[in-house]
Swiss-Prot record:
This is Urease subunit alpha. One of its GO terms (molecular function) is nickel cation binding. It is an enzyme of class 3 (hydrolase). It comes from Azobacteroides pseudotrichonymphae genomovar. CFP2. Belongs to the metallo-dependent hydrolases superfamily. Urease alpha subunit family.
Amino acid sequence: MAQINRKLYSSMYGITTGDIVTLGDTNLKIQVEKDYTTYGEECVFGGGKVIRDGMGQASGFCDEEVLDMVITNALIIDYKGIYKADIGIKNGKIKGIGKAGNPHIQPGVSPTLIIGTITEVVSGEGRILTAGAIDTHVHYISPQQADEALASGITTFVGGGTGPATGTYATTCTPGWYLRKMMEATDNIPINFGFLGKGNSSKSKALEGQIKAGALGLKLHEDWGSTPSVIDTSLKVADEYDVQICIHTDSINECGYIEDTLCAIDGRTIHAYHVEGAGGGHAPDIMKACEYANILPSSTTPTNPYSLNTIDEHLDMLMVCHHLDFNNPEDISFAQSRIRQQTIGAEDFLHDMGAISIFTSDSQAMGRIGEVICRTWQIASRMKEIRGFLSEDQMTGNDNYRVRRYIAKYTINAALAHGLSHIVGSVEKGKLADLVLWRPEFFGTKPDIVIKGGMIAYAQMGDPNASIPTPEPYISRPMYGAFGNAASATSCLFISEASIEAIKGYGLNKMLTVVKGCRVISKNDLKLNNYMPCIDIDSKTFEVSIDGVLISVKPAKKLPLAQLYNLF
């Protein structure tokens, strides 16, 4: 076989086994673990290239046997590994991962990855491919959030709200009549949606009604009263209908302390929002929720990573979002009780240890939806700066394990927590083709292409009046997959099983997808993020110790993936 040096090979066919890539301007380096393509048989498209009739493109197969789209020679980053492969898409789902091409003349072509006459090609050479991100803490305040989310690589929303109502500013609940109306309003938005009903009731009737109307779960929030009776009632209903409960606990400990909340939960599975330094929940020790197997912990973008500006911006944000008054001393005290630099600093460490399992936005309610992905990688880079290599990476000289841990936070673990993992959350055969392609130098900030259900929905695109696609302004723009009936036909509406018949009468176009296994999941099932440390928080000084080690960290003065990437 003819020889070719690595630099030339990577420029033609993408990097291969053993090659190292730096992610953006972070300090994170990944190394290709395996290449599933075949050397000398790589499929590339273009003038004089391989994917032509009788060469890499096969003839004589019926439409059902060949791919609708192939992504060639991409570097996949997923919770399972970091590897190179071709990815095949058929009928909006991932058909196969491996070696694509023409089996008549090429060795090693997977029977599920045949390139034929009807196959479209997206070149993955020199690109990183990830699963679309899942944000499980979205306040549905404005529909324009979808544009920001898609442009950043998010393809699935779980949350609640009714628009810019006072209740939605503070809580992620879509109650009652609004469930159907919000499903109708979002039907042509090219994002998978799931709606949380309002769970704050000590009686079950209203909760059951919302689940039967389509809620995929229920949200408990302190602003509506997260009392022990409310917690117990909602969990009983959730166990009956196999849906998830999300909880924002009692910051001022009015109805009880964290021990009382844990007693009310009574070992049952629950998704705990804001297991963090300043987002709300039992002050100052909500982080202790990370110690328990039945609690699925998540945190949000406002506090991560801990930097010079984190504390300063929090007070104003909190006052606005939770309908508080600067002229009311009690309101000021309420806000200040939630903002603790010691716990904010410790939050990054808990993420790096895999103790906080999921990362979310808290969109327009103190968080920024377009920053879920970039802040995830800012935390990872900052923690490597402070803590060095993870023990799992020390012998390899790369950051593969750390990168897999962090990507799991906004993909597979978010999906597992809400019963979505059978259809989204990873790059796996049979799942919806919600995929994001990145140039390595822009990884985490500006996706090249966002594929939604097998169709390109967003992409970096130049002046539409230009002679080629690349002249400035070269920015993220909606593509054909974001318009018309295609937007709904390539997206899911996640619902409870109890609501199927009711929702069939709503006249929606999105794919109705039932959530599964919400009540049997535990933190032990969450990928690469299931550590349950011993956490002690001093009630007077707010100092945090993790497994007996005092956490003391100064705020970051500079972060990667920040202003440098947003100059133009």
